[in-house]
Amino acid sequence: MIDKKRNIEINERLRNLYKKYQKEYLSMYIQRFKDPDPPQRINEFGIIDAERYDTDNGILFIAKETHGWSNEDYSKGIFFRSWLKDMTEHGLHGHASWHPLMWYNLGRWASLLNNPSQDISKLAEIKSISEIGTLAFTNINKVRGESSSGSAYQNLAHADITGCLLRKEIDIIQPMTIVCCGTYQEFIRHVDFNGKVIEMPHPGARIKTKVMLNKLSEQLKQYDSNS
């Protein structure tokens, strides 16, 4: 069931969580990334569209990090959650247009999760950007990353504060399904989760669209057969 009020409350609790851990997390980020001009805060994640997220059957995607998130973006109040909602409503622009295939894949995965019986060959031809609006979303790195996820990301991903924040996000969102988008090892390092855990590659990986969709479909079928 979609409960807009509940979804808004979840996002507000997440916003307060990020404020509470902001100083500690930024300190660790600066230590790991050696960022000479870090932002004054961390990013905001959570339920993308409060009017579309089914809280009782919720799906949380966990990705690695954002690239190119400038201090100006932060100072203007441009945060990941609201930016992603805008993208689902108005299409790719800005940061998202740099790697469109990644967002198309995320949309297709969301679509398949919401309707597992659909034809994969047809889905592979659809961009499905709007389907991302049915998800909750977070990143392992809550600030920003480099052009590729290297040792700085790994060091931050392994930090205790990263695991602490991730567990608290999951506790607030209470998803039924978690999809690890190239983050499965980071996830199992920090989290013990009783729901469905789907292991997927990075959505921008050089893997054929249908291969990734079949990987997702097979995992969903495996969960169904075990239920």
Predicted regions and their residues:
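A polyanion-binding, active-site-adjacent surface
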Residues: 2-173
